[in-house]
């Protein structure tokens, strides 16, 4: 896991993507919803703290896994760690840890801004159970999106193919009535874009289920040999 974190910090693109996301949070926190009512401030909490982050980590996860094959570092990595599932496990743990940490940061920031603009009651500080439940949903959805990204990157073994595949599948999911907010790419949208006072439980379970299924598929795909 430390190796994977080092790779992220050493990669200019991945490092800059996270830095840009954090910088974008500043004007959003200052200006977005400055005139919003207390109800809309609470209802926007899940989307503002997790939606952009979830899809950033989905893309980042795909890049982390697929870059091993693009730059052929997988050959050396698998020689050092013959148990290939441990490499995939380290990548998954890394994006989950990153997702949990960044979710905590953004969620805390948006709650703090809501309290400053309105009051503690608006952001449910008087109802810690409800606030904790909302936080848990954000973390789960963000981490599930990140896991899907890693799995897709490991399956496709190419960053461009992984990202184009995610975008293409996501668009197809949104077209179909039965697949909208239920597929591996669009289910986090169904969780995080909804008002905080509501929860599409089917989308949440779909998001977690797809993360588990994608991980299983990636583990099976590890048996494939590397191209010569």
PLM-predicted stretches and their roles:
Residues 12-14, 21-64, 88-157, 192-209, ...:
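Secretory targeting signals
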Residues 7, 94, 170:
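Active-site micro-motifs of SAM-dependent methyltransferase domains
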Residues 2-14, 62-88, 147-161, 214-228:
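Cytoplasmic membrane-interface segments at the C-terminal ends of transmembrane helices
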Residues 29, 99, 174-175, 215:
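Hydrophobic transmembrane alpha-helices of multi-pass small-molecule transporters
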